[in-house]
């Protein structure tokens, strides 16, 4: 590693320089992207010990196989076997520290418009000191007095924050559906893109119908599972309702771009949430004619799959981290932030393209051609920020609360462990059901709002 690269990495950790990879074969990194990835890396660093804290089996293995583990636990006054660092209360405290960390930066970076200011330098650099600050905040949360009051209050704060995090994701899904359809419709006259749009709509409807049909086969029985039957019937009816509403003459009159692509995407998402809710539902056990306990309303292979708890748990936890990280990245782009504030680009500026959602964060700069050695960073925010710094930290704050509530099984926290993460609970079931219904209502509102308020200008 060259001296210039070492100096660059030191400037990244202890100064305001951007972080990137040094080797010549590695791609160049925009500062706007590398900063977000670093914060997500810190976010993941906190989630990992939270998962360990919710796993009694992992803590037992650590006690048995790590030398001087008990001495270490006594040294930090965490109990003989670190029992004070295990369970939902420990996760609450660690996530409280992480939420405070992102709240501080949310306030600090409010109204930052370019990367030249002092506050922007703090946001984009000084990673070593920020890691120390994050560790200090998470550790300091364990010294909060009056544990019972703190946990009760923080639980409801976490529930409210998680609700807003879910709402942001649902709003962006609806916005993405409208933007996707509008973008592809812009090219139907010149490049026959409507063929692809129609084909994709048919594929998505096939997925939705097939998914509901498979759930009807595996999650219902002829003489039982009435609640699952009602649930599938209601959600199938909602998919039909939004599809008919999207192509109705009154909606088409106000929104000529409305078609089957948006409701097809929403129907697929409703189907996914329905499946996710059914898999999160507590098992229903009845006695058969021989007096044996039998689990019903779930597929047989699902019972076998759940028995391998370690594989299901850690794969599911990994998927949770990936999905939340992706949500934080996609919901903090400038276009997504503007969409949440009902600010959209002019329709005539839309260019039809298949991969519009993967556009660059910013234009290439001259520095892209000049970086030859050392950290390969492209400073793409000198003229203006690519994303809202404050909003990015706000989303990560909400994501911290969402992770906290998800890992501790929402309001069934007393007996929650990471090993029973996918066993199911009514709290998780109803959260996913509410998310599903809210998504449908949000999409319906985008269709009927121009009809209810004709004097107002709506654009999506």
Swiss-Prot record:
What residue ranges are annotated as transmembrane? Answer: 37-57, 90-110, 125-145, 157-177, 198-218, 230-250, 259-279, 310-330, 391-411, 428-448
Q: Name one Pfam family in it.
A: Serinc
Q: How does it sit in the membrane?
A: Multi-pass membrane protein
GO biological process entries = antiviral innate immune response; myelination; phosphatidylserine metabolic process; phospholipid biosynthetic process; plasma membrane phospholipid scrambling; sphingolipid metabolic process
Q: Which residues lie on this side of the membrane: Cytoplasmic?
A: 58-89, 146-156, 219-229, 280-309, 412-427
The reaction(s) annotated as catalysed by this protein in its Swiss-Prot or TrEMBL entry are: a 1,2-diacyl-sn-glycero-3-phospho-L-serine(in) = a 1,2-diacyl-sn-glycero-3-phospho-L-serine(out); a 1,2-diacyl-sn-glycero-3-phosphocholine(in) = a 1,2-diacyl-sn-glycero-3-phosphocholine(out); a 1,2-diacyl-sn-glycero-3-phosphoethanolamine(in) = a 1,2-diacyl-sn-glycero-3-phosphoethanolamine(out)
What is the induction note for this entry?
A: Up-regulated during the differentiation of oligodendrocyte lineage cells and during brain development at the time of myelination. Down-regulated in the hippocampal CA fields and dentate gyrus by seizures.
Kindly list every residue the record annotates as glycosylated: 113, 183
Answer yes or no on keyword Transferase. no
Q: Please tell me in which tissues this protein is expressed.
A: Brain. Expressed at high levels in the white matter and the oligodendroglial cells of the brain. Expressed at low levels in the liver.
> A GO molecular function for this record?
phospholipid scramblase activity
Tell me, in one coarse class, where this protein mainly resides: membrane
Q: Per the record, what is one GO cellular component? A: Golgi apparatus
Keyword Magnesium found: no
Residues on Extracellular side: 1-36, 111-124, 178-197, 251-258, 331-390, 449-460
Q: Where in the cell is it found?
A: Cell membrane
Protein keywords: Antiviral defense, Cell membrane, Glycoprotein, Immunity, Innate immunity, Lipid biosynthesis, Lipid metabolism, Membrane, Phospholipid biosynthesis, Phospholipid metabolism, Transmembrane, Transmembrane helix
Q: What does this protein do?
A: Restriction factor required to restrict infectivity of gammaretroviruses: acts by inhibiting an early step of viral infection. Impairs the penetration of the viral particle into the cytoplasm. Non-ATP-dependent, non-specific lipid transporter for phosphatidylserine, phosphatidylcholine, and phosphatidylethanolamine. Functions as a scramblase that flips lipids in both directions across the membrane. Phospholipid scrambling results in gammaretroviral surface exposure of phosphatidylserine and loss of membrane asymmetry, which leads to loss of infectivity.
Q: Which family does it belong to?
A: Belongs to the TDE1 family.
Tell me what this protein is called. Serine incorporator 5
From which source organism is this entry?
Rattus norvegicus
